[in-house]
Amino acid sequence: MSANSQPVLVADIGGTNARFALADTSLDAPLLKESIREYAVAEFPSLGDAARHHLEQIGAAASRGVFAVAGRVDGDEARITNHPWVISRSRTAAMLGFDELHLINDFAAQAMAISLLQPEDVVQVGGAAWVPGKPGQPRNYAVIGPGTGLGVGGLILRHGRCYPLETEGGHVSFPPGTPEEIRILEILSEQFGRVSNERLICGPGLVNIHRAVCEMAGIDPGQLQPVDVTARALHGDPQAMRTVDVFCAVFGAIAGDLVLTQGAWDGVFLTGGLTPKMLDSLQHSGFRQRFEHKGRFSSIMARVPSLAVMHPHAGLLGAAAYAADAERDAPGVAA
């Protein structure tokens, strides 16, 4: 363990649930598995209350923390859309009696997790196989994940250090690539005005695509949830099956664009709550064809790995990696 003998409290705060764990940053696999818990955010008035409850539940103490939140971190505060908590770093640290507390974006944590992932933590989705870089080897990675929304980030590895890219790339404009997708854009524009990638590639995005597909077919889409769309697709419903096909193809196109934008030639990691659930669809769809279909760069894109992250606690793992990196920056710690 580091100079501080206590483990670090790490958290992954989403719109509905909050996950906590203790991490020993001196270990290659830093998460202390027996300490991992998940709580509904609605059960607690604040992040500090949830964190304190967790420490009480596991009978542990901590004086440092890294909390990843599903929103933009702006100075001392983090804001999550439609979330009951107003998250203040300083107030939360004071409430917990912490000497040090970092708030980071959830996809900064997902990106940092790449530095600790093992080959068994990922599943190849077409293309080249992933070979983790050797210590000190420069690497550029992208990360993208559909869940309640669409998270986008990246990771730059230089001289043994990790530099996460915090972005709001899920909100860039949706670029249709086929006549069908142009029509889907037109239909969604009638509802939303501007249409971002997140309007299609996330859980609610499945419903949006399904509604557009049904409108093109002259069929009432009904009032469905994302799980209803995927369930209907499994049972052979034509519109639901087409929805999943469009989702995977657009996801692939966007992931490929992200690689080009970030120069992430060493691979893109697919995370988020939907990726494990839709893994079979991603592997047997147009995802990879659209990922590679980049004109003069198609042959280069064919060599870029696309990898589904299957680690059950990647956000917590990334928060632990961030904590380890922060320790190396601490005064008196040799690089």
Curated annotation (Swiss-Prot):
Signal sequence annotation: none
Catalysed conversion reaction: D-glucose + ATP = D-glucose 6-phosphate + ADP + H(+)
GO molecular function, one term: glucokinase activity
Annotated keywords: ATP-binding, Cytoplasm, Glycolysis, Kinase, Nucleotide-binding, Transferase
EC number: 2.7.1.2
BP terms from Gene Ontology: glycolytic process
Family to which the UniProt record says this protein belongs: Belongs to the bacterial glucokinase family.
Name of protein: Glucokinase
Lineage of producing organism: Bacteria, Pseudomonadati, Pseudomonadota, Gammaproteobacteria, Lysobacterales
